[in-house]
Amino acid sequence: MSMEEPELLLYEAQPGDSIHSVAVRFGVIPAEVESPDPLPANQGLIDPGQLLLIPRRLTNIGPDERLIPDSELIFSPHASDFNTVEFADAQGGYLSSYRQTVGTQWLSGAEIVERVALNNSINPRVLLAMVEYIAGWVTDPSVPDGDAFNYPLGHVEEQIPGLYRQLTWLANELGNGYYGWRAGTLTDVHFWNTGSLRLAPDLNAGTVALQHFFSIVHTQQVWEGAISREGFLRVYEDLFGDPWAYEYPLFEPGVEQPDLILPFELGKIWAYTGGPHGAWERESAWAALDFAPASSISGCVLSEEWAVAAAPGIVVRSDNGTVVLDLDGDGRAHSGWALLYLHVDHKDRVPVGSLLDEGDRIGHPSCEGGVATGTHIHIARMYNGEWILADGPLPFDMDGWIARAGSKPYQGALVKDGQEVLACSCASQESLITR
């Protein structure tokens, strides 16, 4: 080997890897990623386990120990049978007696963990372990006071007091790490007030989520302790055992999006008001798209238009402006393909248990559920509990319209056969689309 030729690294593709994301993480261009076996012709997913040859170009990288599997960071099928309330009650800590109003409901601490896990599709075991690691609330019955009560996860900010908002902030940051690694937009951790470090390129997304979260709240020295085997992982293992015992293969070889139609009725004209943006929280996985019905009045107004099922499925959730449609018919939102509809008005909203065909009515668009400035429908895809990036290796495809992201959330376009529909909250002529 000549001096000019870099050493070649042998890397085994992980579920969710694409040529683009792998190249970014290893600091090479996509053409330098090679394999003894055929690679995807487009930017699709690489089969898990496929061997890749990649030039070594990075130096001074962070720890490369994988802490938890991806399936233990997100709300994967293995989390579906976990009972958060029963577990917390059995531990006897303050979490089981904590109460807080969320929306119009009075929830226990464990119910809040359950709500945040479900909404953000983050594994409840990880959230519980974080609450224990940072606050000790899972096993310690002592009643906290002051900032320890108001800001249990240590993020002291006036806008996010209480366990619900603290956990929502945590879930968003874990998602930023996880999906930033998936998308190839995150390559470094940035420590609290003390610089940054390049992430080891062969880490998995679940581990990166933890490394990212601990970096934004700690100096590098404290961060190193948090991600060591005697840090967060020790607390997790004390509560739940070996995280790798819960490993679940999230993406099998050849996985494809099922056929989807645009989520409104045939012949209707709607506006494409939001390109790829956060599936639940605004900053996390850019998995969602927004559509709004035609209206002469802006803002949150009543609409008689209908959002419809983009594919056949069974309704497994219908509450608080939210409808989740399970596409594989097993009755579980976090196994196989599922669609999230947000901002569905309570009037005429389809109930849980409904079996829908493609094009059947879901409900009316509104501002109900979450933050919204105008009547619309927000739609996102999940596969085995993972939000699927709208402009990723499995692009959002509805009636042949393919989502393309912009440089900022909510920007972008839908493209089909040389046509382009631009995302704009203004509902301009360029944003109009019809089935």
Spans of features found by a protein language model:
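Short glycine/threonine/proline-enriched tight-turn/helix- or strand-capping micro-motif at secondary-structure
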Residues: 252-255, 259, 270-309, 341
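Alpha-helical segment that forms one wall of the substrate-binding/catalytic cleft
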Residues: 95-119, 125-128, 134-142, 155-202, ...
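A structural signal for short beta-strand/turn segments enriched in small hydrophobics and glycine
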Residues: 272, 309, 313-315, 353-365
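Zn2+-dependent peptidoglycan hydrolase active-site motif and core
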Residues: 302-352, 374-376
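Acidic, glycine-rich catalytic/binding loops that coordinate metals and/or anionic ligands
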Residues: 258, 301, 308, 351-357, ...
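Short alpha-helical segments in extracytoplasmic peptidoglycan/chitin-binding modules
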Residues: 13, 18-36, 49, 117, ...
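Primarily a LysM-type cell-wall glycan-binding module
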Residues: 1-29, 50-52, 56, 68-115
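Non-catalytic cell-wall polysaccharide-engagement segments
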Residues: 154-273, 410-435
